[in-house]
From Swiss-Prot:
Highest taxon above the source species: Eukaryota
Pfam families, sorted: Pro_isomerase
Domain PPIase cyclophilin-type: 1-160
Keywords, comma-separated and alphabetical: Isomerase, Rotamase
EC number: 5.2.1.8
SUPFAM superfamilies: Cyclophilin-like (SSF50891)
Catalytic activity: [protein]-peptidylproline (omega=180) = [protein]-peptidylproline (omega=0)
Name of the featured protein: Peptidyl-prolyl cis-trans isomerase-like 3
InterPro entries, A to Z: Cyclophilin-like_dom_sf (IPR029000), Cyclophilin-type_PPIase (IPR024936), Cyclophilin-type_PPIase_dom (IPR002130), Cyclophilin_A-like (IPR044666)
Gene: cyp4
A single GO molecular function term of this UniProt record: peptidyl-prolyl cis-trans isomerase activity
Length: 170
């Protein structure tokens, strides 16, 4: 199972770990299928660390703090931490949260290996195409003192490849 994020700076194809983290995968894929991430900006960009997707269009979070965003169930959901899924390379995709069991809709992609994130954030995917081109361009975008990109760029749309939840009632 994979999705492609079509961004202003290029495409990022992500393998989604549906079997390992089924609830997180279901949430992410359903949000992708609904157009939830379409036109959302990347609001936090820390070179050498990660880039995070903003939810301003859907949560009304004018602060750009990344603390907004609900799951498909309308509330936060529990972590699915797996010892086999680690922040061990560039391109790891994880849920952003504000503490244990507070996953919603926000996610981030790592720019490098960050083992200190293991056991704190649910890993649900890995970039399988675009890590050497699109992520490189994103990482080079200048940021302000709060790590907000000075050049706005967005997820224009998302393509889902072989969606296993398409036949499920949500």
């Amino acid at each position: 199972m994979s999705v492609t994020l079509h961004t202003d700076l290029g495409d990022i194809k992500i393998e989604v770990f549906c079997e390992a983290v089924p609830k997180t995968a279901e949430n992410f894929l359903a949000l992708c299928a609904s157009g939830y991430y379409d036109n959302n900006t990347f609001h936090r960009n820390i070179p050498g660390f990660m880039i995070q997707v903003h939810e301003h269009l859907h949560t009304g979070d004018p602060t750009g703090t990344g603390k907004g965003g609900n799951s498909i169930w309308g509330k936060k959901f529990n972590d699915e931490i797996r010892s086999t899924l680690k922040h061990n390379s560039r391109g790891i995709v994880s849920m952003a949260n504000s503490g244990p069991n507070t996953n919603g809709s926000q996610f981030f992609i790592t720019y490098a290996k960050h083992p200190h994130l293991d056991t704190k954030y649910t890993v649900f995917g890995k970039v399988i195409d675009g890590a050497d081109s699109t992520l490189d361009m994103m990482e080079k975008v200048p940021v302000d003192e709060k790590h907000r990109p000075l050049q706005e760029f967005r997820i224009k749309s998302v393509t889902i490849h072989a969606n296993p939840i398409a036949d499920k009632q949500l």
